[in-house]
Amino acid sequence: GLLEDIDFSAWKQVVDTNLNGVFLCTQHAFRVMKAQNPRGGRIINNGSISAHAPRPNSSAYTATKHAVTGLTKSASLDGRKYDIAVGQIDIGNAATDMTTAFTQGVAQADGSVKVEPVMDVSHVAQAVVYMANLPLSANVLNMTVMATHMPFVGRG
């Protein structure tokens, strides 16, 4: 919704889910990965294309996804000395319950409503598997996976 209309409790719920959840999982994974033998591991955070180009009326969601990007970069830096690789996958328009409405049309930055293509969610899973299978000497800090015809470049 519009920024001025967002109820603070709704804002906090989005922050708790999208940011605090990622923080708590990353924090716990760091503790486990530092203590295990051999030390290290890989963390892949769930970002969003909205961290790069927001949709209209998505302040809470967009803000949390920007924050996840910052957390991912910071954790990647902090994890280096412990052989912890931290990366993020930014997903655009994967076919899920959340994107069903995209086939009827989605609000655009210019005020229009346009149908947007979606991709099979299995492509996201394949990208995550690729990231996860890299040796710890290599890290994909950020990967964007989206439908080929998704209006991302030039969206905002």
Place the predicted regions along the sequence by residue:
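Active-site loop immediately N-terminal to the catalytic Tyr-X3-Lys motif
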Residues: E4, A53-S59, E116
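A short helix-coil junction within the Rossmann-fold of NAD(P)-dependent oxidoreductases
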Residues: G1, H28-G40
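C-terminal helical subdomain
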Residues: Q88-I89, A107-G154
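Alpha-helical segment proximal to the catalytic Tyr-Lys
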Residues: R31, L77-R80
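Active-site helix of classical SDR
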Residues: T26, T64
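Residue(s) in the substrate-gating loop at a strand-loop-helix junction
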Residues: S48
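Substrate-binding pocket helix/loop in short-chain dehydrogenase/reductase
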Residues: L2-L3, D7-K12
